[in-house]
Amino acid sequence: MSKSLQAIRGMNDILPEQTPVWRYFEGTVSRLLDNYGYKQIRMPIVEFTELFKRSIGEVTDIVEKEMYTFEDRNGDSLTLRPEGTAACVRAVLEHGITGGGQVQKLWYIGPMFRHERPQKGRYRQFHQIGLEVFNLDGPDIDAELIIMTWRLWGELGIRDAVKLELNSLGTSESRGRYREALVEYLSAHHDKLDEDSQRRLKTNPLRVLDTKNADTQAVLVDAPKMADYLDDESRAHFKGLKARLDAVGIPYVLNPKLVRGLDYYSKTVFEWVTDKLGAQGTVCAGGRYDGLVEQMGGKPTPGVGFAMGIERLVLLLETLEQIPEEISRQVDVYLCAFGEEAELAGLALAERVRDQLPNLRLQVNAGAGSFKSQFKKADKSGALYALILGDDEMAQQVVGFKPLRGQGEQQSIAWDALAAHLATCVVQG
């Protein structure tokens, strides 16, 4: 027997009853970014594998274990993008839009791919909204990114459920000095480290800091602290960022073990975390990557950005029951018409109403049916009101207006007055 066709493990369909919440979230974010002056960019989901090896780092978990990589018919090694920053940097370099010190404030949205073990809040195809800013090197733009997310959490009603964690990784030089001290300390406690941390000690020592292993965490209690190795420039930058967050009133926690999983970060790194989603608690993360553009073949160009996970934030909205009631309702008004003449008149009437009320969600019954069956579909649609058009209404050139979600008697509304009536009852209120 042939195997039934189904989605690949960890790559999920987003069904019609789920998409309203996604659209609400995405719309809220895009309006906010427009208001802050960010412009959207769209990149391919497939890139040359070398792009991610050069940017993310060949000894990171993403490149070593998690990328979907394949060879195309030309023999080129291609990869489904595991994150968006590298692709965005490639795009701005290829098209020269950061040349001459041009400031670019960009955002993107789309699917990313990592071959991880699927669990709640973590998938092999997942969706992110990301921001990248180029040619601004001060702490003011770092603060703006965090302030924007703080405002977003407020608009979504989840501000009390998330916490901001901050750290500074310094410059590559100061980070190198810290890495030497950390390696020396961890090497002296090598036998107490878990197997994965022993491997990371050889390949990417800073990643030992974000271990989840309790024994290794105990070893790290007395490990050297990144803050003690920061250069003066990074120290001043971090102080400036904290001062701006304090001025706006955004609370934060300093986390000296916060390093992020990608090699290109420098100076500021941050994460927004929640304890409402179990182990997958990071909902938004980012930081500064001043050396990445040069590393990828461009001129020295400061950069900073972040990405937020849509699946996790949608799950958080659902967990906290912070989804506006009207978001779940996809239909405002359902028009029932009985008889061929009424169907034709109803179709024309619906289009006239749509001309006057373009934001009204009006569904016209399709497939005819009895009075009972059409009303059943109207109720199932979630509409607030049903419009009724039968022989009596046709004769009087009126439409029956019946509330479906509360008290109220059916009324007869003249065709010419219908749009104004709907504007009062539905659009305005």
UniProtKB/Swiss-Prot annotation:
Stored Pfam families: HGTP_anticodon (PF03129), tRNA-synt_His (PF13393)
Q: Which UniProt keywords apply?
A: Aminoacyl-tRNA synthetase, ATP-binding, Cytoplasm, Ligase, Nucleotide-binding, Protein biosynthesis
GO CC, alphabetical: cytoplasm
Q: Which SUPFAM superfamilies did the record assign?
A: Class II aaRS ABD-related (SSF52954), Class II aaRS and biotin synthetases (SSF55681)
List the catalytic activities from the record.
tRNA(His) + L-histidine + ATP = L-histidyl-tRNA(His) + AMP + diphosphate + H(+)
Q: Where would you say this protein principally sits, based on its record?
A: cytoplasm
Q: Which GO terms describe its molecular function?
A: ATP binding; histidine-tRNA ligase activity
Highest taxon listed in the record's lineage:
Bacteria
Q: Where in the cell is it found?
A: Cytoplasm
The GO biological-process annotations, alphabetized, read as:
histidyl-tRNA aminoacylation
Mind telling me which InterPro entries this protein's record contains?
aa-tRNA-synth_II, aa-tRNA-synth_II/BPL/LPL, Anticodon-bd, Anticodon-bd_dom_sf, His-tRNA-ligase, HisRS-like_core, HisRS/HisZ, HisRS_anticodon
Task: Give the range the annotation lists for the signal sequence.
Answer: none
EC assignment: 6.1.1.21
Q: How does it assemble?
A: Homodimer.
Name the protein family: Belongs to the class-II aminoacyl-tRNA synthetase family.
- Can you say what this protein is called? Histidine--tRNA ligase
Q: Where does this protein come from, organism-wise?
A: Pseudomonas fluorescens (strain Pf0-1)
